[in-house]
């Protein structure tokens, strides 16, 4: 297979998605005065919109793997299922299992050698088989903080396996199956919004996120095929593009008002996935736009190490909180909002940079053998 297309601007959008996720976790405090302050409540409230970073990652990953598969079919006439799964494993597994196994070793050491009380962890098989999102639905998130993040990787892995077989054996129905995923997701979300309302299911269940993946793959299909719809939206001028971003920002400002309506909750993920789908097309294919995120070396750098940023920032937060409690460090609203997030971000960036250069890169070089 020849060199696959590289979307420079999309790398940078990964950094922006991480900032969303980071904002949901970075404002930490155990001081009642800080927690009850109006400023903290306001900032932390909007920070909870960080889940949209994950929504974007779902759409983007589906777009990229589908695009690569279509390229592969065009160049070779077939899709290498085994090679695809190996490539995905080489990218996802090293950091993932490093964190999982380290966490479990630390857990047993702390519990049985230090005799320190610590919440029980899920059965490790939930992580090994990438089904911890289902565990979380039933049991909640009251376990080691930085392991909780891995539920989204479970969903990604489940989709990779499912989608690889679709790409291998049902490729000619790709468009229809993508649309079907969106419909299934909407029906699923409707059922768990009205018939059997369970918030954890709406958030953590794989079926609830199928719309994200369906839209991502559909965007790849219409872009590669250069459909009329693609030609229209990929040539949006500045004003039309600005209108999309205004809709997005407005939805964030009034999020709690808009999505307090149960009917709109059904369409929440699809709504944002469509906006993210537009951003992907705009950044990947519209050469006339004035704002191209890939022009920022800083965003491109952070985008390159974004997987590490996502996986490691929870560990840094965990140690920060532990340190604050261990040394009884006094807190105030300014340290919580400015100092601690800055320390967390800088530390996470340094760890992720060296992880990418000296750990992940070894595995990434192996990926080239499987194209």
Predicted regions span which residues?
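Membrane-cytosol interface segments of multi-pass membrane proteins
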Residues: 1-201, 206-209, 229-242, 298-306, ...
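Alpha-helical transmembrane segments of multi-pass integral membrane proteins
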Residues: 105, 213, 218, 241-358
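Acidic/histidine-rich catalytic neighborhood
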Residues: 219-223
């Amino acid at each position: 297979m020849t060199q696959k297309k590289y979307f420079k601007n999309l790398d940078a959008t990964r950094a922006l998605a991480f900032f969303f996720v980071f904002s949901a976790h970075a404002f930490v405090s155990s001081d009642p005065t800080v927690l009850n302050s109006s400023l903290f409540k306001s900032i932390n409230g909007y920070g909870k919109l960080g889940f949209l970073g994950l929504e974007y990652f779902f759409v983007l990953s589906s777009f990229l793997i589908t695009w690569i598969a279509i390229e592969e079919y065009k160049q070779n006439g077939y899709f290498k299922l085994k090679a695809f799964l190996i490539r995905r494993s080489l990218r996802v597994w090293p950091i993932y299992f490093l964190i999982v196994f380290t966490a479990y070793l630390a857990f047993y050491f702390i519990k049985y050698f230090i005799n320190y009380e610590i919440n029980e962890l899920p059965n490790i098989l939930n992580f090994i088989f990438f089904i911890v999102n289902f565990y979380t639905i039933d049991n909640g998130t009251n376990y080691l903080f930085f392991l909780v993040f891995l539920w989204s990787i479970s969903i990604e892995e489940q989709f990779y396996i499912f989608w690889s077989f679709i790409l291998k054996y049902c490729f000619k129905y790709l468009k229809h199956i993508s649309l079907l995923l969106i419909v299934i997701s909407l029906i699923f979300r409707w059922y768990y919004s009205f018939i059997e309302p369970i918030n954890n299911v709406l958030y953590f269940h794989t079926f609830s996120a199928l719309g994200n993946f369906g839209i991502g793959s559909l965007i790849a299909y219409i872009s590669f095929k250069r459909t009329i719809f693609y030609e229209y939206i990929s040539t949006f001028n500045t004003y039309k593009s600005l209108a999309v971003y205004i809709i997005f920002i407005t939805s964030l400002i009034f999020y709690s008002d808009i999505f307090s309506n149960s009917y709109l909750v059904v369409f929440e993920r699809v709504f944002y996935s469509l906006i993210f789908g537009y951003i992907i097309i705009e950044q990947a294919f519209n050469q006339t736009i004035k704002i191209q995120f890939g022009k920022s070396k800083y965003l491109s750098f952070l985008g390159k190490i974004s997987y590490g940023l996502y996986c490691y920032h929870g560990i840094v937060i965990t140690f920060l909180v532990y340190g604050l409690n261990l040394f009884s460090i006094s807190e105030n609203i300014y340290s919580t909002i400015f100092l601690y997030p800055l320390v967390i971000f800088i530390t996470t960036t340094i760890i992720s940079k060296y992880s990418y250069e000296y750990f992940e890169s070894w595995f990434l070089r192996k990926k080239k053998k499987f194209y």
